Amino acid sequence: MSEPSDVITPTETNSVWAERTGTRRYLAHNARGAEVAVGMGPGEFTPGELLKVALATCNTLSADHRLAKALGEDFDANVICATLKNEEEERYSDFDVQIVADLTALDPDQLAVLTERVRRAIDRGCTVGHTLDKGAATRLHLLDDEG
């Protein structure tokens, strides 16, 4: 564990928190009032599923303006994040993000241009993707709530 001086001070913009609601069950919060149930049971996301949804939606949020310009402001889309897991190391080895939308109105050249623009938008704006690509240091601090 790190020394207390290494603790990043939580703020509304750099942190989320979760409170324990039962055995292996937490309710996660952000400063904007959103909540998500985290656990292994019905109606709950596992931490791994949250990581997948974070990457998937980071991609689509980063590219939304490009997709809307090509497909129309009210376009319908779904995004899927599938993974391969290295069971021995208890980690995901590969992430595959699939954006699914009606692309039939685009000819092959338009589709190629849109694909490149979507990739560039994601490369510019997806913090979750950048973090997974480059890695990030993680630290654990066990803190006394009375101190």
Residues covered by each model-derived region:
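Extended beta-strand/beta-hairpin segments
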Residues: 1-53, 61-147
